[in-house]
């Protein structure tokens, strides 16, 4: 059932996937559902809802990624990082979170599903100093764009971008982008079976 739904959703967003990638995405939902019962990793309890609200909500960003090295800040159980890593095996993803149970889950997913292009790091973002900066800084965890830019300003490479995943856009928030940053692009995203608004903001350092 989930496999057929995933097939339809991927076709709807025009994202090609191999049989192995589809299996990894479905198995990720299965592991998230299983671990969630014990570790409370997400408030979404139903696998079909997870497929929409976690997998597809992450994958609609995939075709907009530019570069090779990405960091997913406040990734939780690996969202959007793990689905994006599955669909972009040529890119590297660092998954950053401060809670050990989330990092343990991510590492188990990586091991069981054979995802070799992610590395999970347990750290607060302000304490994390990467040896190499990133082409893209992703997050759907921050309440405000201002918070994301304030906490993550040290992470992008010289020509790197911030990818802020937001729901409905707040005009006031857009007007209070911190100095030194500029919104390069606002992209409206359409997630299959989801009525709520979704936006991707690409932000650069000036």
From Swiss-Prot:
Does the record carry Methyltransferase as a key word?
A: yes
What EC number(s) does the entry state?
A: 2.1.1.170
The family database entries (SUPFAM superfamilies) matched by this protein are listed as: S-adenosyl-L-methionine-dependent methyltransferases (SSF53335)
The cellular location(s) given in this protein's UniProt record come to: Cytoplasm
rRNA processing in keyword set: yes
Question: Cellular component terms, GO, for this chain's entry?
Answer: cytosol
Predominantly, its location class is: cytoplasm
Q: Which superkingdom is the protein from? A: Bacteria
Annotated positions binding S-adenosyl-L-methionine: 74, 79, 125-126, 140
Recorded catalytic reaction(s): these are: guanosine(527) in 16S rRNA + S-adenosyl-L-methionine = N(7)-methylguanosine(527) in 16S rRNA + S-adenosyl-L-homocysteine
EC class, as a word, reads transferase
Q: Name one GO molecular function term.
A: rRNA (guanine-N7-)-methyltransferase activity
What keywords are assigned to this protein? Cytoplasm, Methyltransferase, rRNA processing, S-adenosyl-L-methionine, Transferase
Chain's role = Specifically methylates the N7 position of guanine in position 527 of 16S rRNA.
The family line of this record is: Belongs to the methyltransferase superfamily. RNA methyltransferase RsmG family.
- Protein name per UniProt: Ribosomal RNA small subunit methyltransferase G
Q: Which organism is it from?
A: Shewanella baltica (strain OS155 / ATCC BAA-1091)
- State the gene name recorded for this protein: rsmG
């Amino acid at each position: 059932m989930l496999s057929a739904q995933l097939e339809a959703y991927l076709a709807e967003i025009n994202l090609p996937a191999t049989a192995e990638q589809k299996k990894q995405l479905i198995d990720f939902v299965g592991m998230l559902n299983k671990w969630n019962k014990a570790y409370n990793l997400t408030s979404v309890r139903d696998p079909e809802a997870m497929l929409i609200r976690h997998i597809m909500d992450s994958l609609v960003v995939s075709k907009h990624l530019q570069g090779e090295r990405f960091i997913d800040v406040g990734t939780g159980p690996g969202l959007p990082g793990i689905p994006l890593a599955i669909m972009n095996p040529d890119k590297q993803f660092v998954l950053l979170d401060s809670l050990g149970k989330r990092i343990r889950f991510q590492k188990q997913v990586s091991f069981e599903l054979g995802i070799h292009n992610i590395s999970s790091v347990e750290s607060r973002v302000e304490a994390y100093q990467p040896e190499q900066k990133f082409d893209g800084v992703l997050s759907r965890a921050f309440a405000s764009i201002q918070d994301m830019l304030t906490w993550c300003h040290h992470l992008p490479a010289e020509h790197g971008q911030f990818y802020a995943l937001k729901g409905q856009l707040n005009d006031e928030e857009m007007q209070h982008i911190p100095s030194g940053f500029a919104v390069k692009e606002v992209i409206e995203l359409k997630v299959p079976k989801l009525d709520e608004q979704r936006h991707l903001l690409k932000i650069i350092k000036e």
